[in-house]
């Protein structure tokens, strides 16, 4: 299968848009101002194991995302498959499988009540999304939210993120298409440093929204063990053991969401939101004490460990 994004070598310095101080750009994905030239694949696109085919334009349609494996997800409500008015189709960012990408959230298997409550927080402004969820939530009806929540709650989670400890990663950029981080064509490698870099395991399949092709999260060496200590024990009083509320396996308890196997960028964004007050929902009262003493390195380590589970 040809790659949908066929890049030509680029010898241009990429300039990131300004980031809010204290928020790491590896977690808060902002498209680079300069983008590499791309040539979209012409004709029908296929992915392994699926009888379906789509054009590049259909794959990128935010009002009708591809359903590569309809038997795995069942019939989706209209709000998930097509959106409504200014409301994008939920499946365009979260995928019809619910697994999402680095810039969105993995909703598969979360409780419907939790999703409904989260959408209410976006609607009211109690939870501020750095991108688009507040604007999406406001015009949605209670019935649309309920249907979307029940759909994503019915999906099977797991097996989406592979974590690898390393010192070196490919040079990357954040695409304007979907705000995905992708390898910079011809860019070589660079030190990872104090970052987590998430990339599709297969670029062509990832940019085609293939729900069977997940992500690899490159994390600093030693970060998973450090995160394990913080998550399991609270790090000698620095924080509170996550399993108390999220379950020993981090798969969630009741309406408390799972954090196991989530995109580390997403987990980090939520911890920063609790720290900075951009999430001042009811649940933030519990999380404030959890995040109060966490450093940037702690948040990175927790995100790395949670993703590895």
Describe the residue ranges of each PLM region:
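Extended intrinsically disordered, low-complexity coil regions enriched in Ser, Thr, Gly, Ala
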Residues: 108-134, 260-272, 276-284
């Amino acid at each position: 299968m040809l790659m949908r994004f066929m890049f030509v070598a680029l010898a241009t310095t990429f300039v990131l848009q300004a980031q809010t101080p204290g928020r790491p750009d590896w977690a808060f994905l902002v498209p680079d101002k300069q983008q590499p030239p791309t040539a979209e694949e012409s004709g029908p696109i296929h992915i392994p194991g699926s009888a379906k085919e789509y054009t590049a334009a259909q794959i990128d349609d935010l009002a009708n995302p591809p359903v590569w494996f309809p038997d795995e997800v069942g019939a989706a409500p209209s709000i998930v498959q097509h959106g409504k008015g200014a409301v994008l189709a939920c499946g365009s960012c979260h995928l019809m499988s619910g697994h999402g990408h680095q810039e969105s959230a993995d909703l598969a298997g979360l409780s419907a009540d939790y999703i409904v409550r989260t959408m209410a927080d976006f609607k009211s402004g109690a939870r501020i999304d750095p991108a688009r969820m507040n604007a999406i939530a406001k015009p949605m009806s209670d019935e649309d939210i309920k249907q979307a929540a029940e759909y994503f709650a019915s999906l099977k989670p797991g097996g989406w993120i592979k974590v690898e400890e390393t010192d070196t990663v490919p040079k990357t950029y954040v695409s304007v298409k979907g705000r995905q981080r992708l390898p910079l064509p011809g860019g070589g490698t660079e030190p990872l440093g104090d970052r987590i870099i998430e990339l599709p395991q297969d670029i062509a399949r990832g940019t085609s929204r293939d729900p069977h092709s997940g992500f690899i999260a490159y994390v600093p060496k030693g970060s998973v063990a450090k995160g394990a200590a913080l998550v399991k024990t609270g790090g000698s009083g620095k924080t509170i053991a996550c399993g108390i509320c999220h379950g020993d396996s981090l798969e969630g308890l009741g309406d408390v969401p799972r954090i196991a196997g989530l995109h580390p960028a997403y987990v980090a964004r939520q911890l920063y939101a609790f720290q900075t007050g951009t999430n001042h929902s009811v649940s933030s009262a519990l999380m404030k004490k959890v995040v109060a003493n966490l450093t940037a390195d702690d948040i990175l380590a927790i995100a790395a460990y949670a993703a590895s589970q």
